[in-house]
Amino acid sequence: MNSMNILNKVKNVKSYTRLVRQGFLSQQRNHSVSVNEVDHFNELAKTWWDWDGGSRLLHLMNSTRLDFMTEVFRERNCFSGKKILDIGCGGGILSESMARLGASVTAVDASPMAIEVAKKHASLDPVLNGRLEYIHGSVEGSQLPTTFDVVTCMEVLEHVEQPRDFLFSLMEKVKPNGRLVLSTISRTLLARLLTITLAEHVLRIVPVGTHTFEKFIRADELSNFLKEQNWIINDIRGVCYNPLKQQWTLDKPGSSGLGLSCNYFLSAQKPMSA
């Protein structure tokens, strides 16, 4: 069964202050999954592995994600033997890559259509047998009895209803001294211009309605939240997309460029005493 057959078979807060009050500052642990967001990504699922479809930017970003993780881990063959949990895996773009690099990956997504696409695509590659497990669900609701060396959650935070609660759920799945690797979008006017106005409405390289500005979280807000929980920030870097070259560029360590004003990656380490 080829990729086209798979794709054809699967069918597809008024202000940030209010969002923060409901999310980061709320002590109530609520479910983070948004029905509207799940419906949106169910629609995108049918083109997840189409390089010219709505997930094209994620395909182009994937090697940059792996580069960031490799630099942060500072280990040779850094994925080999690692137990990794990939939350919000979508169709499995990152999950498959990490499994091919030697990790044992458990991948979870709230979209049933995305998980169906991911399973069928992974079945095409025998190398992934025994290395990659897909689960339909959420980090709060999925039966995950163990903790992991690494938890990844890429391009997901900007889509959840309760970011604070969601982050706590992610953090619980990381073993002591393990890593949490995140990527999301900063809540700045530049990010709004680039990710919503330009990417969605002008260039149409991202489906309209994919992003909600009020859900974006600034890099300093996210890093400060993690520090308050006594986590160590290993690295935080911006990543910029050049539509002319059609490529993503990762900021150099310590860079104070414009990258953190839009898309950014963050790696944090759980304290041993946690």
Swiss-Prot record:
Location of this chain's protein in the cell: Mitochondrion inner membrane
EC number, UniProt record: 2.1.1.64, 2.1.1.-, 2.1.1.114
Any GO BP annotation: ubiquinone biosynthetic process
Entry's Gene Ontology molecular function annotations: 3-demethylubiquinol 3-O-methyltransferase activity; 3-demethylubiquinone 3-O-methyltransferase activity; polyprenyldihydroxybenzoate methyltransferase activity
Residues reported to bind Mg(2+): 155, 158-159
UniProt cross-references to InterPro entries, sorted A to Z: SAM-dependent_MTases_sf, UbiG_MeTrfase
Cofactor dependency: Mg(2+)
Main enzyme class: transferase
CDD domains reported in the protein's UniProt record: AdoMet_MTases (cd02440)
Cellular component terms per the entry's GO annotation: extrinsic component of mitochondrial inner membrane; mitochondrion
Organelle transit peptide residues: 1-30
Keywords noted in UniProt: Magnesium, Membrane, Metal-binding, Methyltransferase, Mitochondrion, Mitochondrion inner membrane, S-adenosyl-L-methionine, Transferase, Transit peptide, Ubiquinone biosynthesis
Catalytic activity: 3,4-dihydroxy-5-(all-trans-decaprenyl)benzoate + S-adenosyl-L-methionine = 4-hydroxy-3-methoxy-5-(all-trans-decaprenyl)benzoate + S-adenosyl-L-homocysteine + H(+); a 3-demethylubiquinone + S-adenosyl-L-methionine = a ubiquinone + S-adenosyl-L-homocysteine; 3-demethylubiquinol-10 + S-adenosyl-L-methionine = ubiquinol-10 + S-adenosyl-L-homocysteine + H(+)
Job description of the protein: O-methyltransferase required for two non-consecutive steps during ubiquinone biosynthesis. Catalyzes the 2 O-methylation of 3,4-dihydroxy-5-(all-trans-decaprenyl)benzoic acid into 4-hydroxy-3-methoxy-5-(all-trans-decaprenyl)benzoic acid. Also catalyzes the last step of ubiquinone biosynthesis by mediating methylation of 3-demethylubiquinone into ubiquinone. Also able to mediate the methylation of 3-demethylubiquinol-10 into ubiquinol-10.
Identification of the protein by name: Ubiquinone biosynthesis O-methyltransferase, mitochondrial
Organism annotation: Schizosaccharomyces pombe (strain 972 / ATCC 24843)
Organism ancestry: Eukaryota, Fungi, Dikarya, Ascomycota, Taphrinomycotina
